[in-house]
């Protein structure tokens, strides 16, 4: 067939411009290559070589981030953290508009993240006494001699506790249903009335009326007590029957649950079993004279969410513990409550709130890896949810009773004027935070480190920063997307981590995400000493299968010869193929690149191309020269 001139194009172009890959079906002509169904003969010469190379995977970019940092570094993909004060709840340790990844983490237990740049163990809580009571209560105060103290109500018993010991106050009568205080004066309510007393003195009865589900609280220099669906105001001089109700809810099944106050109002939360609300009561009338007057409902919970405890703090914030979890509200200038979303949602909800410094603590049930304890909320640290952008406050799990899973926290208070907490657990016990003894162990888990992309990554190294000499130890392990935990290294004693990289030999191969877990253990000989973690860093590389760049020169003339020296073509043949090729390149879609003689087919996109005609046009004006295609593979396999 040598020397035969073929005057028609013997191929079919499949899918040009239709979004398909395009494939050339071989005919009698012996071509070398085809791209998108257009066949070509090789134009390889010394000056026009065929080349293959790896495609770059790191783009050159201008860094206009406000702060210098990891995004400015070349080579490694880096993620690091040097403070943990943003609290728990982050899913991905990835940058966003407010860069929460810099200071938040996924979860923790038994550790204190609230000092910037320093993660330590929390103090231990010990059981002072056990209880079989479903509603144990505690209330902290400073006694008349200046000693940090708290009252413990356990059934029909009322007991004063100090660090040195305890003193029984009441040991008979009906079970105490509600406990409050005003300074060193206690108040409690039970089914046969309301009682008060100073420190450890025997109680005096304020009212002898029978009470149903009573709640008592000393607020705004008043004694507020509820019974069934009614609200009453008492004074220390009003011994006897209950006075007329200040307010009675129209629903006879309504029950009041908790009382607190704000700068200008008293708030009482209650529910009918399905609907739960916070009612506002004014404490002065229009003339500025003292009064207690119902002014309306200031907050209504979503259907099915029942308030258990409300707690006002520093005249601005109001904690709302419900059967669904915990919310933080704010009191506006009119005394109305604006509450936010649920910060966290333990399985059994929350009960009991106390505030100190910039924090609130709220009780939970079996939310500390099966044990019962407290959550801490940082009122001075607002964050926004990564997905919904809802405003939230930083939080984390806090102190807990080790091995305590009998019931939920029913009450929490401060131990006098100290920074130590005391909490009561239904059917369990009364727990007091220790002054110096630390928990034996605790951990922190980072969010999922995925570098803001679903592309696979190769996680190669991590490093940690901690003091040169550790009191105790820190063990680091990796958490994988398959749910596994891989132990890496433990630092202890005088072993300093410095900034040395630790290789992560596992997990093997590309991963979508990776996380670290830091387990802190206190000193073996001194329970008041424990390790500190100051920061961490992870190094990774892109794990995508590398693309190839192919540079392929082909002939583009009106009349050509194939590999078998068979002539083919016609006038305008080069122009026609060039225009077809340019249409494919402009479309930018993936195409099939065929190396016909080797029977290889590769999916590619056209990255670039150049047509070069070294000589002047033929007499007929037709073009002819070398077309150099720069192709990038798109569907490589391992």
Residue ranges and their predicted role:
Residues 406-445:
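Blade-level signature of beta-propeller repeat domains, shared across WD40, Kelch, NHL, RCC1
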Residues 2-169, 178-185, 189-202, 222, ...:
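N-terminal beta-propeller domains
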């Amino acid at each position: 067939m040598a020397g035969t001139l073929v005057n028609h194009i013997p191929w079919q172009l499949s899918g040009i411009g239709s979004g398909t890959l395009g494939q050339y079906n071989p005919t009698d002509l012996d071509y070398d290559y085809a791209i998108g169904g257009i066949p070509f003969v090789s134009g390889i010469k010394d000056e026009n070589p065929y080349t293959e190379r790896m495609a770059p995977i790191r783009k050159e970019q201008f860094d206009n981030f406000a702060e210098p940092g990891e995004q400015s570094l070349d080579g490694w993909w880096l993620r690091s953290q040097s403070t943990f004060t943003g609290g728990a709840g982050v899913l991905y340790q990835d940058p966003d508009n407010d860069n929460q990844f810099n200071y938040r983490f996924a979860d923790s237990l038994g550790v204190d993240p609230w000092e910037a740049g320093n993660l330590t163990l929390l103090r231990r809580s010990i059981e002072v006494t056990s209880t079989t009571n479903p509603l144990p209560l505690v209330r902290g105060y400073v006694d008349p001699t200046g000693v940090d103290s708290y009252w413990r109500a356990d059934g029909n018993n009322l007991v004063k506790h100090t660090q040195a010991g305890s003193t029984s106050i009441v040991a008979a009568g009906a079970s105490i249903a509600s406990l409050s205080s005003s300074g060193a004066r206690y108040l409690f309510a039970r089914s046969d009335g309301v009682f008060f007393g100073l420190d450890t003195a025997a109680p005096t009865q304020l009212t002898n009326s029978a009470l149903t589900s009573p709640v008592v609280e000393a607020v705004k220099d008043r004694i507020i007590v509820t019974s069934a669906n009614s609200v009453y105001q008492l004074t220390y001089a009003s011994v006897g029957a209950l006075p007329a109700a200040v307010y009675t809810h129209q629903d006879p099944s309504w029950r009041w649950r908790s009382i607190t106050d704000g700068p200008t109002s008293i708030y009482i939360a209650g529910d009918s079993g399905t609907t739960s609300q916070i009612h506002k009561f004014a404490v002065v009338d229009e003339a500025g004279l003292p009064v207690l007057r119902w002014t309306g409902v200031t907050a209504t919970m979503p259907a099915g969410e029942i308030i258990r405890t409300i707690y006002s703090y520093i005249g601005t914030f109001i904690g709302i513990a419900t059967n669904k979890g915990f919310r933080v509200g704010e009191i506006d200038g009119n005394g109305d409550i604006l509450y936010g979303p649920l910060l966290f949602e333990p399985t059994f909800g929350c009960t009991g709130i106390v505030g100190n410094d910039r924090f609130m603590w709220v009780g939970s049930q079996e939310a500390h890896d099966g044990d019962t304890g407290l959550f801490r909320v940082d009122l001075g640290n607002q964050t926004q949810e990564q997905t919904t952008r809802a405003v939230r406050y930083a939080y984390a799990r806090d102190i807990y009773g080790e091995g305590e899973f009998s019931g939920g926290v029913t009450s929490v208070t401060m131990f006098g004027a100290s920074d130590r907490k005391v909490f009561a657990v239904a059917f369990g016990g009364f727990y007091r935070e220790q002054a110096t003894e630390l928990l034996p162990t605790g951990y922190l888990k980072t969010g999922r480190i995925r570098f803001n992309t679903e592309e696979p990554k190769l996680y190669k190294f991590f490093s940690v920063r901690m003091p040169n000499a550790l009191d105790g130890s820190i063990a680091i392990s990796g958490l994988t997307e398959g749910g596994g935990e891989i132990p890496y290294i433990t630092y202890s004693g005088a072993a300093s981590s410095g900034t040395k990289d630790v290789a992560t030999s596992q997990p093997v191969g590309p991963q979508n995400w990776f996380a670290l877990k830091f387990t802190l253990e206190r000193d073996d000989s001194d329970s008041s000493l424990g390790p500190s973690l100051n920061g961490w860093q992870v190094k990774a590389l892109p794990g995508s299968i590398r693309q190839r760049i192919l540079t392929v020169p082909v002939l583009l003339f009106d009349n050509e010869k194939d590999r078998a020296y068979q002539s083919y073509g016609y006038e305008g043949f080069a122009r026609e193929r060039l225009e077809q090729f340019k249409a494919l390149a402009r479309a930018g879609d993936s195409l099939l690149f065929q190396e016909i003689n080797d029977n290889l087919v590769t999916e590619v996109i056209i990255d670039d191309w150049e047509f070069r005609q070294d000589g002047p046009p033929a007499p007929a004006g037709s073009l002819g020269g070398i077309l150099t295609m720069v192709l990038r593979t798109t569907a490589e396999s391992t």
